């Protein structure tokens, strides 16, 4: 019984924890925002605290209540080694049997004498009827009447004999009855004392069980719901709406399109420049500067030679920037052969890097590595413009893998595909 109630408390606590986990998961989806998230977090905490409370109740029912009862049973009820009966019960049965053994022997004798006396009386009554019928029978003979009368006389004698034996048996039973009453009373009182001890202990354990189950007496119960009320009271609708308006509404800072001059040198350095070559850990070269250089053969300024994969700028005579090292060849008296050698060397390096980049996937950063993400929900429709962008409809669920970069783009995963999406989408 106690174990069953403890299992009920455990199951209730388990369901509360599952409910709290679902609230936490829903909270992480980002559907609710601002101070309104206090409602979900408050309900989740209330469920967790109540689950802990009922887990403690289940533990309290097992120990000390159930454990105490089992220990008391082991100390007061001992099982027999040769049977499943309880030794104490068997001992009481034996004591009751011994207390009434002598009296019971006389009692059986009384029942036997009574049965014999009643049988003799029945026989006499039957013979008396037969004698009366024989006297009234016109065709009867004197010999038949005499035989029946002889049987009647013997029956009357047997009746007297059994009556006397019956009375003597009752007298003997009366003589042993006081001792029988005394012995039976002694054994009965002993059994009553044992049963009284059991009932008193059972009552004590029931009261202890009541203390464990009485959640109204738990000091932390009221604090659970006071904390829930205080948490929910912190919800401020006006503050949430104002914050939303500042982030996504009419109060947000305007960012209308303005005219931008096309710059092919910088097009590879935007949000899509995430190749292994551009990664600092890949050992590739990095753009250090953009310069206007003068060709000795042309006598006018030409744009510096750059490559989106290697990000190298070259200069005919002044400085060639490769990685973080600069080499000064002098600015005076440079010959065309010096210029040609410098450019050819840089061009060879650029060609080598181009070949290595062509052998790598177009967007190696967007290969799904199976890492877990944070579930979020799209607030607006968005159609990807380039191949590494994700497309969504309002309300779609997807996963965020990385926070936004300096360009305002986040990395996410939808339907098993990894790509970029604008921060304002979520």
From Swiss-Prot:
Residues 287-315, 350-369 are annotated as: Disordered. SMART domains: SH3 (SM00326). Keywords: Coiled coil, SH3 domain. GO terms for cellular component: endosome; plasma membrane. One of its GO terms (molecular function) is phospholipid binding. Residues 305-315 have a biased composition (Polar residues). CDD domains: SH3_PACSIN. The keyword Iron does not apply. The keyword Coiled coil applies. SUPFAM superfamilies: BAR/IMD domain-like, SH3-domain. InterPro entries: AH/BAR_dom_sf, F_BAR, SH3-like_dom_sf, SH3_domain. This is Antigen EM13. It comes from Echinococcus multilocularis (Fox tapeworm).
